[in-house]
C-alpha cells in the first residue's frame, strides 16, 4: 500500500548498463534516449535510475552508466542538462569518486565526464553546480587527472654532462657505503628502520619525478596514471606498474622497459622509487621463510581434515588441533598472495626475456648461414685478356723475366736490322729445328721489341707463352729432342746437288763455341765461317721460343738406320732436283744423310769436327 512507485526507466537503464556486456551497446543506449524524449518526466526518471546503477559495486556497470549519462547529455536537450547538474546526481558521483574501494578507472572516468559537462554547461549560469562539484573533486583528488604530456625536446650538452656527473657521484657513494657497512651498524639501524616504517604510513602522497632529474640515479619508477601511447615508440602502462629505467632520451622523457616492451614515457606520469636497501631485502627473505615454514602445517591440516571426513567425525570445530592449525596457516595468506604477485611478474619478465633471446639467436644464426652461403668476393683484379701478337697490359702482374725475350720472325716481316748480324742457327747448347720457307718467299725480318713502360718485377716477359694461354706468334714451333728419337722428314731426305769440299757447312755467323764441342774433340781453331752475302735470301727462320729440353752434343758416329726394303715407299721421288745455275755438275759423292737445300743456296759442308760424311744429324 505504501510501496514506492516503480520507475519505468529501471528496466531499460539496467539493460543498457548490464555487467555482462563486453562493450557499450549503442542500440540499448539509443532506446533510452528515445524513451526520455517521449515523456515529460523522462529526464528526471532516467537520472534517478542511473543514480541507482552508480551505487552498484561492479566497475563495468559504473563505467557503462557514465557512458549512458554522456549520451543522454548530447541527445536529450536542456532538460537533461538540468537533471545532470542537479545536487543529487553530482553528490552521487562525488561519493563514488571518494570511495577507496572504487576502481581507479572509474574515478578517472568520473573526473573526465565532469570536466566535459562543466565546459558544456558553462554558458548557462543555472548549471553551475556541475562546475563547483568538478573543482571540488580536483582539489580532493589531485592525482585523478592525468597531466598533459611534456614536449619532446632534445637534451643539451650541459644536461648530458650533468647526468654523467651524477652517475659518477652515485657510483662513488655506492662504493663508499658498501665498504663502510658492517653487521653491527645494520643491527644498530634496525630499530630506526622499524620506527621509520611505522611513520611511513603517514607519509604524504608520492610526487611525480621533478623536471630536470636525470636517469643516472634512478633505476625504477612507479606509474601514477594510465598512459596510452599516441605516437610510435611510446611505452604503454597502467597505474601502479613498476618501470625499469634505461636511459634519458629527451629532456622530460625517459626510456624504460615493462613486461618485455621498451619505449619512452613522460616523467610527470611516474614517481621515483628508491632501490631496495639491504634491510628491505633481508625483510623480504624473512617473509618468504615464514611462508615456506608453514608448508608442513598446511599439509598436516589437510591430512587431519581428510581423516576426520573419512571417519565420519562430528563437527571439526570441536577438534582443537584442527582449529589451531587453521588459524596459524590463515595468517600467511596475505603474504602468500603478495609473493605470488611478485614472482608472477618476475616470471613474465624472464619469459619475455627468454623469447627475445631466442629470437635474437635465430636472427644471428640465419645471418651467419646467409653469409656462409655466399662465396667470398676476390679482393684482387682478374687478369685482363689480350689478343695474339699483342704485348700484355702494362698493369698486369706476372713473374719476373729470367732472360731477354727471344727474337721473333715471321713470313713477310722483312729483313732484320742492318746493325745486327743474323745468326743461323742461334748460338747455344741446343740448336733448335729450322723450317725451310717456300720458294720465292722473302727472308723474314727481325721484330725489334718496342719500348714499353718500366719493367714490373712480376710482369710476364714478351714472347713467352703464359700458362694456360696460347702463343702470341703464328710461327710453327717444335721441341728439340735427342738424336735417337729425332723425326726424319722423308720428303726432304734426298741428296742435294754436289758440293765442293770447301763449302761452308753452317749459315752466316754460325760458330761452334769451344765449350759446346763434342767430348773427345779439340776446340775449333781459326776464324768463324762466313755465310752468304747479306743480299742473299736466308732459308732459316728462328722459332719464337727457346727449346725446352736439354740436347746432348751430336755424335759424329750416329747415322740414320738403313732403309729396309720392306718398309714404306718414299713419299718423294728419289732423284735429285735440277741443279741451279752456277752449281757444279759433277755427280754427288756417296755420302750419308744431308739436309735439304733449296735452289740458289750454296751447299753446306760437313760441320767442323763432324767426322766426315756422317755430318750433323737431326
Curated annotation (Swiss-Prot):
Keywords: Endosome, Membrane, Protein transport, SH3 domain, Transport
The VHS domain, residue ranges: 16-145
Cellular compartment(s): Endosome membrane
One BP term from GO: protein transport to vacuole involved in ubiquitin-dependent protein catabolic process via the multivesicular body sorting pathway
GO cellular component assignments: endosome membrane; ESCRT-0 complex
CDD domains xref list: GAT_Hse1 (cd21386), SH3_GRB2_like_C (cd11805), VHS_HSE1 (cd16978)
Record's compositionally biased regions (Low complexity): 196-214, 495-509, 582-593
Function in brief: Component of the ESCRT-0 complex which is the sorting receptor for ubiquitinated cargo proteins at the multivesicular body (MVB).
Protein name per Swiss-Prot or TrEMBL: Class E vacuolar protein-sorting machinery protein HSE1
Native source species: Phaeosphaeria nodorum (strain SN15 / ATCC MYA-4574 / FGSC 10173) (Glume blotch fungus)
Taxonomic path: Eukaryota, Fungi, Dikarya, Ascomycota, Pezizomycotina
Name of the gene this protein is made from: HSE1
